[in-house]
Structures are given as structure tokens and as C-alpha cells.
């Protein structure tokens, strides 16, 4: 242990009997030696290598202030990252995590204000809900128990620090303190790694499912496009047939009108009946029956009918 400057009381105290001043000076000397030793140990590496800014240690969770309290909300930017990260990872599975974050940061900066405001509004809504739940939790019995437990742990730590100082003054190693300083670290690390592995496995499984669903979706989209094309083709054919039907109906109406007008001067023999648009079919049947009964007698009528039919056919067919 390196020795720094001691207090005058500690340097000039007699070595014989124990006096109150001697005990206090010894405590101060021990504290200074510990403080200066730690400073000397910290100073050396800093002179050799500049201190780098480091984030929260990897694999170590931040301590939750309220273990049973409501989950803290995330910002609008974090909501955007959580929503888009898996989509980018699916499209670019080989892209490292920092590159994905960098890509999403650039995408966020170029995002339209209206779209960006949507995430900010959702984050603000979640924040207000969190404040309500936090206030309700602070009024609950669980919060009181939690704060009491935190206070008890704080007192235990202070007692442990006092016990460490007493042990040093008595010349013993701080076995209990060393055991407390490494408390639960291996267990925590193993549990964290197991949880992280399980989470990564679940993410891989979900990504595979997502890829399978996207492939099925692509197949269904192709079928849908094919069905849509077939439906459009059938609709076009139906429209064409409807136009043809309408044209034929108009042509038929024109032929019936021409026949009615042409046969108006040609009554049925024996009855004197002439056709109208409503009775044209009945008239033609009666005329055909009269001619078949005695063709020789109605030769002039037959010639007249042929002449009318030829003229109507040339004009309307």
C-alpha cells in the first residue's frame, strides 16, 4: 500500500498507550491511505490511455426503481424504431444492428412531419397513461412496501460499510464484504444470457414465420391478380355481348316495323286482316297458312310476298 502524507496527529502520537486522539488519528490515516491508493491506481491508466466514453455495460440491466410499477413509456422515435426494425431486418438479414439503426435514423430525419407527428402523438398518449398508472401505483400498498424495502436495503448497505471499516481497523480481511460485493452477479449473468438466447431464438422463429407468411401472401396476390384479370376480361366480353344484343334488338325492331308497313296493303285472303307491330307474328302465320292451302290460286300473292321480303332484306339485313 502506498503511503501518502499523514495528519500531524498521526505522525506525532506516542506509540505507548492508547489515547482518544491516537485512535481518531489512526482512523483518518487509514482512510487517507485507502483514498490515495485508489487515486494512484486510477491515475496511472488515465495517463497511459485517454478515458473513453462508455455506455451502459453490455449484458447488464439497469436497476428498476419501481420493480412492480407500471412500465415506462418510450419516445416517438423509439416507437418508430421498434415498428420498422424487424421490417428492415427481414429485407436485409445480413445487415448489422448499428447499420440498421443508422438507416432508421436517416429514415426518421426524412420522415414527413405528419407521419412523424403520428408517432409523437402515440408516445404522448402512452406517457399520459403511464403518469396516471404511476400515480395510482404510488397510492397503493405495493408502492409503500417497495419503498420500505428499498430503504431497508440502503440501511443494510450503510451497515455493511460500517462493518467493513471496523474490520479494517481490527486488522481482518473483509470476507463478508467481498462476498456481498459479488452478490448474485454470476446468477444474474447466466439468467440474462439464457433469457437473451431464448429471445434471439424466438426472434429467429418469428422471422422465419414472417418470411413464410410473406411468401404465401405473394402467392395469394398472384392468384388475386390472375382472378382480377380474368374478371376484367369477362366483364369486357359481357359488355361486348350486351352491345351486340342491343344492336340485334334494334335491327329486329327495324325489320318488324318494315314488314308491318310493307304488308299493311296486303290483307290475308278470306279475312282481310292486316298486320300491326303487336300482331305481326300472328298475321304472318295466317298468311302462310292461306298460301299453303291453295298455292295455285294465290300465285300473284306469292309473288307480292317475295317482292316485299326481298326489299326488306336488302334494306335492313
Curated annotation (Swiss-Prot):
A Pfam match: HMG_box
Q: Where is the composition biased (Low complexity)?
A: 1-22
Residues in coiled coil: 190-257
Q: Which residues carry this modification: Phosphoserine?
A: 160
Q: Which residues form the signal peptide?
A: none
Glycyl lysine isopeptide (Lys-Gly) (interchain with G-Cter in SUMO2) crosslink location in chain: 31
A GO cellular component annotation in the UniProt record: condensed nuclear chromosome
Tissues expressed in = Widely expressed in adult tissues, particularly kidney, skin, testis and uterus. Highly expressed in embryonic tissues with high mitotic index, such as the proliferating ventricular zones of the fore-, mid- and hindbrain.
> What does the record give under GO molecular function?
DNA binding; four-way junction DNA binding
| Region annotated Disordered, chain positions | 1-71
DNA-binding region at which residues? 70-138
Task: Report if keyword Heme is assigned.
Answer: no
Which locations, inside or outside the cell, does it occupy? Nucleus; Chromosome
Write out the entry's keywords from A to Z.
Cell cycle, Chromatin regulator, Chromosome, Coiled coil, DNA-binding, Isopeptide bond, Nucleus, Phosphoprotein, Transcription, Transcription regulation, Ubl conjugation
- Annotated PROSITE patterns: HMG_BOX_2 (PS50118)
Q: Which GO terms describe its biological process?
A: chromatin organization; chromatin remodeling; negative regulation of protein sumoylation; positive regulation of neuron differentiation; protein sumoylation; regulation of DNA-templated transcription; skeletal muscle cell differentiation
Cysteines joined through disulfide linkages: none
UniProt lists compositionally biased (Basic and acidic residues) regions at: 31-52
Describe the protein's quaternary organization and the partners it interacts with. Component of a BHC histone deacetylase complex that contains HDAC1, HDAC2, HMG20B/BRAF35, KDM1A, RCOR1/CoREST and PHF21A/BHC80. The BHC complex may also contain ZMYM2, ZNF217, ZMYM3, GSE1 and GTF2I. Interacts with the BRCA2 tumor suppressor protein. Interacts with DTNB.
Query: What PANTHER family does the entry give?
Result: HIGH MOBILITY GROUP PROTEIN 2, SWI_SNF-RELATED MATRIX-ASSOCIATED ACTIN-DEPENDENT REGULATOR OF CHROMATIN SUBFAMILY E MEMBER 1-RELATED
What function does this protein fulfil?
Required for correct progression through G2 phase of the cell cycle and entry into mitosis. Required for RCOR1/CoREST mediated repression of neuronal specific gene promoters.
Q: What is this protein called?
A: SWI/SNF-related matrix-associated actin-dependent regulator of chromatin subfamily E member 1-related
> Which species expresses this protein natively?
Mus musculus (Mouse)
Query: In the record, what lineage is assigned to the organism producing the protein?
Result: Eukaryota, Metazoa, Chordata, Craniata, Vertebrata
Q: What gene is this protein translated from?
A: Hmg20b
